[in-house]
Curated annotation (Swiss-Prot):
The record marks 324 as: Transition state stabilizer. Gene3D superfamilies: Ribulose bisphosphate carboxylase, large subunit, C-terminal domain, RuBisCO large subunit, N-terminal domain. It comes from Pandorea jasminoides (Bower vine). GO terms for molecular function: magnesium ion binding; monooxygenase activity; ribulose-bisphosphate carboxylase activity. It catalyses: 2 (2R)-3-phosphoglycerate + 2 H(+) = D-ribulose 1,5-bisphosphate + CO2 + H2O; D-ribulose 1,5-bisphosphate + O2 = 2-phosphoglycolate + (2R)-3-phosphoglycerate + 2 H(+). This is Ribulose bisphosphate carboxylase large chain. CDD domains: RuBisCO_large_I. The modification N6,N6,N6-trimethyllysine is found at residue 4. The active site is at 165 (proton acceptor), 284 (proton acceptor). Keywords: Calvin cycle, Carbon dioxide fixation, Chloroplast, Disulfide bond, Lyase, Magnesium, Metal-binding, Methylation, Monooxygenase, Oxidoreductase, Photorespiration, Photosynthesis, Plastid.
């Protein structure tokens, strides 16, 4: 074969509309906005090329390998309804392009380079189909939903959490005191804020000690198992593991990590440590909106959520639908199912582009957190169901009577909603009535209801489904 130098159009090699995808391929759905004058086939093929074997010109060394075996292929393109110049381009990647058990390598390949590509005005990775053959190379969540329930001995209801506020500035002793009050009042978990690591006003070791003391005291008083998400996120992997080891030595049930700022390599290491040592792992998604909030550019959160399930985590923040942070209901429920269920059918009405089979990888519990309070409890119980953690930071610590009564109010509201649901009542229609009835016999709940009766965060979601 004679080598022919020069710049060839990408679509000649990488746009193959008739190609059949393999069961072992990783499939990607990209939302592509080409520059004016660039046809969608060329743009789609360019994405496939630049995220797999291609480069800008033909190279001599192409002859030393089998491009047909290794190249990504753009196998289908569809216009986005309601958008003049946007297309969904589907790309299939051969499995051999990826290192086993490495989310880091998967992302470096698929989204590493191509997003700066000049022929594209914008590019967003909307969804990935991870084949069972690749999933089986990952450990996944350290324990998963069922094992967590068994460890905590809590069934048949969502779990309750609270982020300790003010997030920065408390001393370790006062921080521990707030933890104790919330847990004693009836919460299951309290949480380090994502930016609490080890700062001058509160070093990590002191915080770990006082929080452990708080949760043992609360356990003894309530007869329930309690947890505090001790944030092990640190500047180096070694320091992170050191903190996790200390948490294990204290005998606490759960640690926490910021998986996007900490990075997938660190996160996967921590997840392996947690499984080997019986620690649950709570994952915070700090920095996600930088990546996922723009509708036409970046990576959709459902992809970051899938990646986390592969890398490993037992809880992950997944939006509230009703609070202060972004999240359209159908889209949120789509990736909540991707986190929890074993098999998820393709469903474009919920933003799910591919059928995903997790082949028994443990599930992740979605965490609803951010601007929620007792009046939201019926909606949250209905939307998220039992396998979830509902986190009320300000909604606990902002109760007028203090932290413990704030916790009592949340627990009473939750138990009332679960009871009503189990009796067959419609939480969506009767939610306010259910909360009002419960507040008649719980003065703590009545006080909380009074404070937050008018609070709403009324903004339209930025990231919406495409509709005709």
């Amino acid at each position: 074969v004679g080598f022919k130098x020069g710049v060839x159009e990408y679509k000649l090699t990488y746009y193959t509309p008739e190609x059949e995808t393999k069961d072992t391929d990783i499939l990607a759905a990209f939302r592509v906005t080409p520059q004016p004058g660039v046809p969608p086939e060329e743009a789609g093929x360019a994405v496939a090329a630049e995220s797999s074997t291609g480069t800008w010109t033909t190279v001599w060394t192409d002859g030393l390998t089998s491009l047909d075996r290794y190249k990504g292929r753009c196998y289908h393109i569809e216009p986005v309804p309601g958008e003049a110049d946007q297309y969904i381009c589907y790309v299939a990647y051969p499995l051999d392009l990826f290192e086993e058990g490495s989310v880091t390598n998967m992302f470096t390949s698929i989204v590493g380079n191509v997003f700066g590509f000049k022929a594209l005005r914008a590019l967003r990775l909307e969804d990935l189909r991870i084949p069972p053959a690749y999933i089986k190379t990952f450990q996944g969540p350290p324990h998963g939903i069922q094992v967590e329930r068994d460890k905590l001995n809590k069934y048949g209801r969502p779990l309750l959490g609270c982020t300790i506020k003010p997030k920065l500035g408390l001393s370790a002793k006062n921080y521990g005191r707030a933890v104790y009050e919330c847990l004693r009042g009836g919460l299951d978990f309290t949480k380090d804020d994502e930016n609490v690591n080890s700062q001058p006003f509160m070093r990590w070791r002191d915080r770990f000690l006082f929080c452990a003391e708080a949760l043992y005291k609360a356990q003894a008083e309530t007869g329930e198992i309690k947890g505090h998400y001790l944030n092990a996120t640190a500047g180096t992997c070694e320091e992170m593991i050191k903190r996790a080891v200390f948490a294990r030595e204290l005998g606490v049930p759960i640690v926490m990590h910021d998986y996007l700022t900490g990075g997938f390599t660190a996160n996967t290491s921590l997840a392996h440590y947690c499984r080997d040592n019986g620690l649950l792992l709570h994952i915070h998604r700090a920095m996600h909106a930088v990546i996922d909030r723009q509708k036409n550019h970046g990576i959709h959160f459902r992809v970051l959520a899938k990646a986390l399930r592969m890398s490993g985590g037992d809880h992950i923040h997944a939006g509230t639908v009703v609070g202060k942070l972004e999240g359209e209901r159908d889209i949120t429920l789509g990736f909540v199912d991707l986190l929890r269920d074993d098999f998820i059918e393709k469903d474009r009405s919920r933003g799910i582009y591919f059928t995903q089979d997790w082949v028994s990888l443990p599930g992740v519990i979605p965490v609803a957190s951010g601007g929620i309070h007792v009046w939201h409890m019926p909606a949250l119980t209905e939307i998220f169901g039992d396998x979830s953690v509902l986190q009320f930071g300000g909604g606990t610590l902002g109760x007028p009577w203090g932290n413990a009564p704030g916790a009592v109010a949340n627990r009473v509201a939750l138990e009332a909603c679960v009871k009503a649901r189990n009796e067959g009542r419609d939480l969506a229609a009767e939610g306010n009535t259910i909360i009002r009835e419960a507040s008649k016999w719980s003065p703590e709940l009545a006080a909380a209801c009074e404070v937050w009766k008018e609070i709403k965060f009324e903004f339209a979601a930025v990231d919406t489904l495409d509709r005709e």
